């Protein structure tokens, strides 16, 4: 079996993401029971390249297997060039999936996040629904998210598509 993931800190880092991938990501292969207490703090994203195929996101969680992903914190993150997606959180079935069931995503915190320049791309939070399975990511907290000097206070202001998900709170 796979080992659960807990107590991870990514701090004081500088990122440049080229094609094929996401910058600060959890996923796709989430083949454990739990991923929790992961903190991305005080990081600078200089570049996140346009990829054109489910990648190219700056702050991402792609839960394509069974894990319960929760209590994840993105804090004090500065972004200069986000070309394709800003926030991309999905529970999904993908080419990387091996588990039959999909996991849950909840209690995700975004605090002091800023796109300082460059494009202002779309954000996505999407759940999963099949015949007998519904996974609704929930509990997303946005505290002082700033785009080009303007604080955002709603999914619309964040250019966010929300499907099969709920409990988004802005302050």
Feature map (PLM): residue ranges:
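Extracellular/periplasmic carbohydrate-active domains that bind, remodel
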Residues: 1-171
């Amino acid at each position: 079996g796979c080992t659960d993931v807990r107590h991870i800190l990514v701090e004081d880092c500088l990122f440049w993401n080229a094609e094929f991938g996401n910058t600060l990501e959890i996923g796709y292969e989430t083949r454990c029971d739990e991923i929790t207490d992961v903190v991305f703090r005080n990081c600078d994203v200089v570049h996140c390249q346009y990829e054109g195929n489910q990648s190219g996101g700056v702050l991402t969680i792609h839960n394509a297997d069974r894990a319960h992903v929760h209590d994840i914190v993105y804090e004090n993150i500065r972004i200069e060039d986000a070309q394709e997606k800003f926030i991309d959180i999905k529970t999904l079935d993908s080419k990387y999936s091996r588990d039959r069931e999909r996991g849950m995503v909840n209690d995700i915190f975004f605090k002091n996040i800023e796109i300082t320049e460059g494009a202002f791309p779309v954000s996505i939070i999407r759940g999963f629904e099949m015949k007998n399975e519904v996974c609704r990511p929930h509990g997303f907290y946005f505290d002082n998210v700033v785009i080009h000097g303007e604080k955002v206070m709603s999914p619309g202001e964040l250019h966010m598509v929300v499907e099969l998900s709920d409990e988004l709170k802005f302050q």
